[in-house]
């Protein structure tokens, strides 16, 4: 019988599908919020708009609905990328969109889940930021700022909840080897990119009891990039 539930936001994307599969393979009950109804193919799917407090609360409600498998972990994958030129060339709306898309769901879902994670006495939050948060590149100030904010938020959660039995860590991937990224960068050396399954393994470890001593860490997952 499954004894643990993980809530995986962004669980249907290139990385998210690998993360979902990794937890299912390890015997977790996996809850995946999505904007539209999907097929029942393993994880528990819930229609929820994670940009709203109500949507985040709905996702957590489903994740905590099985008493035999209490919510033990939240994995925040929702995000997005857009280039915007130099700072003075980037429209304000685009800068704000990057912040909203990358930071707001992470904040809302984590906020809604924390009381339940505290109640278990052994909860974990894993936030996916990006290498750009610590090694910025030009032409994407909104994205860089948003991913840095995700890491800072995770650090704040780690400090505030360490003594309450909840740990929080951040994963910092470089370029992820997904079909979408290959299509966007067909001439890149894809051998240097990180396969989603390898990142998923790191995330699953950080959500597991084996990582109990670790909180407030930023884990680089760069491959050979």
Label for each model-derived stretch:
Residues 135-141, 163:
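Active-site loop immediately N-terminal to the catalytic Tyr-X3-Lys motif
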Residues 130:
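Residue(s) in the substrate-gating loop at a strand-loop-helix junction
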Residues 12, 20:
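N-terminal Rossmann NAD(P)H-binding glycine-rich loop of SDR-like oxidoreductase domains
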Residues 85-87, 91-97:
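Substrate-binding pocket helix/loop in short-chain dehydrogenase/reductase
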Residues 115, 158-160:
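Alpha-helical segment proximal to the catalytic Tyr-Lys
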Residues 110, 146:
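Active-site helix of classical SDR
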Residues 163-166, 170, 178, 187-225:
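C-terminal helical subdomain
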